[in-house]
Amino acid sequence: MPRSSSSSQYRIKNLTHSTVAVRDIAAGEELTVTYVDAMLPRAQRQARLRDWGFNCTCAHCAAGEAEGAESDARLRRIAELEKKLDDFDDRSVTAERGAELVALYEAERLDIYLGHVYTRAALNFALLGETERASEYAAFAVGAVEREFGPEAGDIRSMRMLAEDPQNHWTWGRRRYD
């Protein structure tokens, strides 16, 4: 079920607004943006939209109860994983937790956040000393962040360095539990 296909940025500095596609858009497909926090459970997203007099009929909001419950469960798991990844004292964090996080974001079609989540996964792989996966996810992060924010966006330089030479990145091996 597709969600937002594009992201909007507002730049106060020069009073500009831009909307960019965060994934490939098929010919004839509408550009979509989200008006509420996409990480909220479905009922909360719909309630917030109703507060604005809007009844969303996108495929994601119109899905059946079972699909909605599965989606909400994935969102809860995302929140759990992000909390674990943020806790450097949590020894249950494995290298694969970052990949699991990416898979959940992809399953939820949260394309507007993929730059962020690929970056997180790449850093987690590097922190745990996984060379190939750190490089792979850093390259994904570069592509997603660059697509959304441009070639000079934050984290691009660090992700390029991580993609090219994981073992010399500042995060390398800092979360190993030898």
Name each region found by the language model:
Residues 1-128, 133-136, 143-144, 157-161:
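C-terminal SET catalytic tail plus cysteine-rich post-SET Zn-binding segment of SAM-dependent SET-domain
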Residues 138-141, 152:
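Membrane-proximal bilayer-interacting regions
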Residues 147-151, 155-166:
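Long amphipathic alpha-helical scaffold regions
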Residues 160-178:
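Alpha-helical linker/edge segments of TPR/alpha-solenoid repeat scaffolds
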